[in-house]
Design a protein with these regions (language model features):
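Basic, Lys/Arg-enriched alpha-helical interface segments
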Residues: 1-66, 75-81
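NAD-dependent ADP-ribosyltransferases
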Residues: 69
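Short beta-strand-loop-alpha-helix junction that forms the active-site gateway
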Residues: 84-87
Length: 87
């Protein structure tokens, strides 16, 4: 897959704000500095990436420590939709 664009849903943005307010702003910074560049190049593969089973549409998970970031990929338009974050 060529470069994939990243789109943050409103729910995901709310989750990130909550993460930052709870004193974990470094997690949000790491997401933007390290995770997004990786997802732009290889959204399906990586040491912290896992495809979730039995989800429709297909949903992927990126893990940073105890945090999980969930996203869906539009293969046709080459967009990764960041849909939720959870601890």
């Amino acid at each position: 897959m060529n470069k994939c664009r990243i789109f943050e849903t409103k729910q995901f943005q709310k989750d990130l704000e909550q993460i930052a307010r709870s004193g974990h702003s470094k997690v949000a910074q790491k997401l933007r500095d390290f995770v997004y560049p990786q997802l732009r190049k290889h959204p399906h593969f990586g040491p912290n990436i896992k495809k979730l089973k039995d989800f429709t549409p297909d949903t992927w998970r990126y893990r940073i420590g105890a945090w999980r970031f969930f996203y869906e990929i539009d293969e046709e338009d080459k967009v990764a939709f960041m849909v939720a974050a959870s601890h």
